[in-house]
């Protein structure tokens, strides 16, 4: 893997300054409920729940909200929604591929809103497999770069089985095989590294480099999709030069 992980960096910056805290919390609560439902309510024995709780704490979610979400997911408290996991594939302008992961209690609403948002942004839904063939499941650990020795991080991650570590300016991004995520995350913790998130992600095999104009269109469409209540994660295969990314950051 080479170059900058634009999407990881963009998501990190967005999370740090996200004014839409209510929507962010709703997504994090869904993650906690699903993790507790699938693996039980004890984070020590459920790595997915541990990471979901950790991510919520990093976003300054109140402890009471987290505790209630765990109880609902584990069945110890009423009120948990029956979420369905749905994945849509689509295209953004300039032929950029999108994978849109949803957690919804209303499949028809999710499909209608995703389709409408894509259409308004000059994108379209794609048939199953037509986009996902260009992506592969990976583990991704995002480590704030300030005060961190990159060489030590790289060595620790590699010894634990990581595939790659990239320098994305404000963060270092550790990439693992999907089954190695928790092992590498724990090794980094044991070595004293702080991290922002540890997630399963979809990483593109090939990327499309965009002009400033196309990058604006694609970024706006992704932001609008991310604002949908049912959308949990969006993965894309676009990249851009450092100059274009700098201009986007200024806007």
Swiss-Prot record:
> Which PANTHER family does the UniProt record give?
TRANSCRIPTIONAL REGULATORY PROTEIN YEBC-RELATED, TRANSLATIONAL ACTIVATOR OF CYTOCHROME C OXIDASE 1
Query: Which cellular component appears as one GO term in the record?
Result: cytosol
Which GO terms of type biological process are on file?
Answer: regulation of DNA-templated transcription
Taken from the record, one Pfam family name reads TACO1_YebC_N
GO MF annotation terms: DNA binding
Protein name per its UniProtKB record: Probable transcriptional regulatory protein Blon_1155/BLIJ_1182
| Key word Transcription present | yes
Q: Would you say which domain of life the source belongs to?
A: Bacteria
Q: Which InterPro entries match?
A: Integrase-like_N (IPR017856), TACO1_YebC-like_2nd/3rd_dom (IPR048300), TACO1_YebC_N (IPR049083), Transcrip_reg_TACO1-like (IPR002876), Transcrip_reg_TACO1-like_dom3 (IPR026564), YebC-like (IPR029072)
User: What are the protein's UniProt keywords?
Assistant: Cytoplasm, DNA-binding, Transcription, Transcription regulation
Localization annotation: Cytoplasm
The species is Bifidobacterium longum subsp. infantis (strain ATCC 15697 / DSM 20088 / JCM 1222 / NCTC 11817 / S12)
What taxonomic lineage is listed for the species of origin?
A: Bacteria, Bacillati, Actinomycetota, Actinomycetes, Bifidobacteriales
Family of this protein? Belongs to the TACO1 family.
The answer to whether keyword Transmembrane applies is no
């Amino acid at each position: 893997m080479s170059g900058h992980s634009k999407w990881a960096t963009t998501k990190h910056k967005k999370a740090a300054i996200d004014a839409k805290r209510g929507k962010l919390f709703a997504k994090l609560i869904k993650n906690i409920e699903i993790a507790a439902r699938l693996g039980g309510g004890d984070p020590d024995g459920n790595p997915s729940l541990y990471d979901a709780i950790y991510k919520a704490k990093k976003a300054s979610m109140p402890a009471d909200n987290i505790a209630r979400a765990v109880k609902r997911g584990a069945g110890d408290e009423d009120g948990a929604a029956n979420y369905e996991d749905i994945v849509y594939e689509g295209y953004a302008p300039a032929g950029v591929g999108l994978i849109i992961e949803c957690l919804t209690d209303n499949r028809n609403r999710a499909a209608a809103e995703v389709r409408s948002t894509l259409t308004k942004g000059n994108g379209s839904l794609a048939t199953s497999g037509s986009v996902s063939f260009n992506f592969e499941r990976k583990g991704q650990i995002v480590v704030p770069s300030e005060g961190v020795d990159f060489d030590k991080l790289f060595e620790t991650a590699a010894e634990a089985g990581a595939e790659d570590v990239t320098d994305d300016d404000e963060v270092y991004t550790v990439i693992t095989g999907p089954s190695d995520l928790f092992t590498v995350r724990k090794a980094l913790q044991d070595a004293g590294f702080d991290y922002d998130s540890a997630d399963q992600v979809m990483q593109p095999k090939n990327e499309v480099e965009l002009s400033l104009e196309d990058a604006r269109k694609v970024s706006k469409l992704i932001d609008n999709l991310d604002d949908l209540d049912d959308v949990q994660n969006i993965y894309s295969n676009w990249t851009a030069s450092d100059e274009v990314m700098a201009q986007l950051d200024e806007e």
